[in-house]
A protein has these predicted regions:
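Conserved N-terminal structural module of periplasmic/extracytoplasmic solute-binding proteins
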Residues: 4, 8, 24-106, 112-125, ...
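C-terminal segment of classical bacterial N-terminal signal peptides
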Residues: 17-25
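A local structural motif
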Residues: 56-69, 85-87, 189-201, 275, ...
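Hinge/lid segment of periplasmic solute-binding proteins
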Residues: 95-170, 227-230, 255, 346-351
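Short, solvent-exposed loop/beta-turn-alpha elements that line the ligand-binding surface or hinge
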Residues: 111-127, 185-202, 239-242, 259-285, ...
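Glycine-centered hinge/linker elements that transmit conformational signals in sensory
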Residues: 209-218, 245, 249-305, 350
Length: 430
């Protein structure tokens, strides 16, 4: 059996002087094997678990995280689940897989467990409803549908997961060049608008200005950038443009949604259709705008290989002025041992589409992942896995995770006065 649980020999039966006996005390060695993408948010969870987790049930619990590279994460997890090997007790699953693996019988329905446990109920009530919608419900319920019901847990709704790491994408930018007086003056002179320097400037940055930034900061080797001659070619902007996994759809969807298009007709479930929706005139126009900015990006953008890790590396190597990437990849940017721009980087909201009233629509995908339990665990392991969920989603652990580059989906934690100051991208996340 792949489930690893060994009962300890702590059946301690003592006879007291009165002749009464102490009831048997059972504890266990429990190993929870968890599939997880290999990146900072999951690495921190493992490190913090090993340092701080104590089982409330008295078990000796080991969290054995199987770290899998992102590009092959889905294939590896899917192969394990469909093989029948029953390797994992928990999985950090991307939310877009939820329905497929629930239908396959691999992910455990947690609805009754949540309803019977006041701690789990309180956690669910504190989670941002957009995350409950994306990470937990199947069949999928929108945030609006959940809020209309009004109860948490909502009657008639099935719940499967809790957030391990709720992610959003933000703008990473070089403050030393975007706030350089000479560059700011030249940009203003060329385009008649300001070069975004502050967080507030990025709040008012749309896709048109994003393209202007890309054009403006395209410099060749030997050109001056912020008064310094360049040793290599330099590019103004970059965002996801990769063929692997979801390394382009997570950006293209934003263009489509912001302009009023969609990628499929969800109202026709369970026979929802994409034909005529994702290739509508509105969606095609939005996709063309996405493509139009690739001309200002490094040559790798033309190869289908410019994924979230490639743009992160380009930024850290000082070859790009601004990127749009996930918060989960922000921490290495600030690491002096890994990043040439660790002391020059700042963060702001991602650009969006300007509306007729002057506002900016930043509708986009929710990133991040829930963790789920698999369906073949014994009751004792299910209970301990849920204890791990409670430990991870208590406010003390969540604030520690945020301080180390993670994010929280708990509204109480995001409302904490210290939250925005814990990491430089937190304001944009909230």
């Amino acid at each position: 059996m792949k489930l690893r649980k060994v009962i300890k020999g702590i059946i301690a039966v003592s006879v007291l002087a009165t002749g009464m006996s102490v009831a048997p005390v059972l504890a266990a060695d429990i190993t929870i094997t968890m599939a997880a993408p290999d990146w900072p948010p999951t690495r921190f969870m493992k490190e913090h678990f090993d340092k701080s987790y104590t089982s409330p049930a008295g078990h000796t619990t080991t969290l054995d995280m199987d770290f899998i590279p992102w590009p092959s994460f889905y294939e590896r997890v899917a192969a394990s689940l469909t093989s029948g090997e029953q390797k994992y007790q928990m999985i950090v699953t991307d939310s877009q897989w939820l329905g497929a693996f629930v239908e396959g019988g691999y992910y455990m329905n947690l609805t009754d467990k949540i309803a019977a446990d006041p701690e789990l109920t309180a956690i669910l009530q504190d989670l941002h409803p957009a995350l409950v919608s994306a990470y937990s419900t199947y069949p999928h319920k929108t945030r609006a549908q959940l809020e209309e019901i009004g109860e948490v847990p909502a009657p008639g709704v099935a719940y499967y997961g809790f957030p391990q790491f709720p992610d959003t994408y933000v703008t990473f930018y070089r403050q030393d060049i975007f706030c350089h007086e000479g560059e700011m003056a030249a940009f203003q002179n060329k385009y008649g608008t300001n070069l975004p320097c502050s967080y507030e400037d990025w709040q008012d940055t749309d896709w048109t200005k994003w393209g202007q930034v890309g054009e403006f900061f395209r410099r060749a080797k030997g050109d001056l950038l912020a008064g310094v001659a360049l040793d290599d070619d330099f590019y103004g902007i970059a965002y996801q443009a990769g063929k692997g996994y979801d390394f382009s759809t997570m950006q293209t969807n934003a263009f489509i949604w912001q302009q009023g298009g969609d990628i499929w007709d969800e109202s026709k479930m369970p026979t929802a259709q994409a034909e005529g929706v994702v290739n509508s005139d509105v969606a095609v126009k939005a996709f063309d705008e996405y493509l139009s900015y690739l001309q200002y990006m490094p040559p790798v953008s033309q190869t289908g290989q410019m994924d979230i890790f490639v743009i992160q590396d380009l930024f850290m190597q000082g070859k790009v002025g601004a990127i749009i990437d996930w918060v989960g990849l922000g921490e290495p940017v600030l690491d002096p041992s890994a990043s040439k721009v660790h002391d020059k980087s700042a963060f702001g909201p991602a650009p969006g589409s300007r509306k007729n009233d002057g506002s900016i629509d930043r509708t986009g995908n929710i990133g991040g992942q829930p963790f789920v339990l698999t369906t073949w665990n014994e009751d004792e392991v299910v209970d301990e896995a849920l204890n791990v969920v409670k430990w991870w989603l208590n406010s003390e652990t969540q604030l520690e995770a945020v301080s180390n580059g993670g994010q929280s989906g708990l509204m109480s934690v995001m409302a904490d006065p210290s939250y925005n100051g814990l990491r430089p991208w937190n304001r944009a996340h909230v």
